[in-house]
Amino acid sequence: MNTRYFTSRLLALMLAALLVFSCAAAEETEIPSGVVDNFVQSEIEKQQSASDATAFEAGAAAGEYYADFTFGGVQTLSGITTTLSLYANLPKYAKPVSAVLRLSYTASDLILTDISSLTYYMNGTPFGSSKIVARSDGAQTVLYVSVPVELLTTGYNLLEILSYVRLTDDEGCRDDYNGANWVKIADTTCLRIYYEISDDADELYMYPYPFISLMNPDGAESVVAVSDAADEAELTAAMMLMAGMGNSLSAENAMTLCRLSDAKSENVLYVGLKKNTPEYLLSLLTQSVPATGALVQRATDGDTSYLLIVAEEEAALSEAAALLSDTSRVAQLHTSQTYVSVGEAQQYALASETSGLTLAGQYTIKDI
């Protein structure tokens, strides 16, 4: 009897000890470091992305000016670190007010998502980062990331996407030689920039706006027109004007050359002698056409924007076309109209050449 009692007592004590140990172990077990933070960060990213998605679409729906810049196709990031670059050119007339990156991608499901990320830079400054999402079903992940507008500048802007992708969490370079650490950026990815038109967009230094613009990159919505009684000089100047705009086109030239009566467009570049120019166009001029040289003026009539080149003498028309084809001279025209003299282009070229020779001929005592 005593032996059975002792045995029962021993088993009870062992069971109690086991329960106490289990409870203590449960109390001391900690949530793995970073799990809560990762969850909270994921929720924050989802909320921010949803807000940026609204910003991405709302402006377009409201009829605001915007431009989309894309990679033009699927891009693949592979290796531990890779950088993908996208250039966005903002002309002088476009004042950026907001920008959103829509990023669509798929990623290898072998990626360690807790330590793999995408970081975003604009003109060398980081503005955001997000963990890479790898879906086993191959579905795309779509993110919307707001770009601080103060990072944008007139001219070329460089957007960079830096990927950091790991398959193993140990030190070493094995990931560099593994083809499974990839992220594919979809062709639906784009940088959307909303902008306003500058208050001085009607000044000549903004040329070739609005005849070529972010909204009209190939010139399809613009025409170069000559008078219905056009002679060879007018046609020559008009073709020079079209050729000069070629460098400003971001797509194949779709601009047309036509007679004024056939100009069915809201953007008209007109080249004509005064004697062949209809009165309704002459009435838009705020300055008189000179006896020598040409008058170049921006004007509007209702919904139509004009660039009018009018002259008394034939040679002046080609002179005006040469002026507008020279970006360095156009950049100095902070006015809506200007006069051009015959021979001005040659004088400018000689002055530039002489200036270059003078600079080239400058020596210091040290050089000698």
State each model region's role.
Residues 1-2, 45:
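Generic cytosolic/nucleocytoplasmic N-terminal low-complexity/intrinsically disordered segments
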Residues 2-11:
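Bacterial N-terminal signal peptides that target proteins for export
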Residues 11-12, 26-27:
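Short, low-complexity disordered leader/linker segments with a strong preference
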Residues 27-368:
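Solvent-exposed alpha-helical segments and adjacent loops
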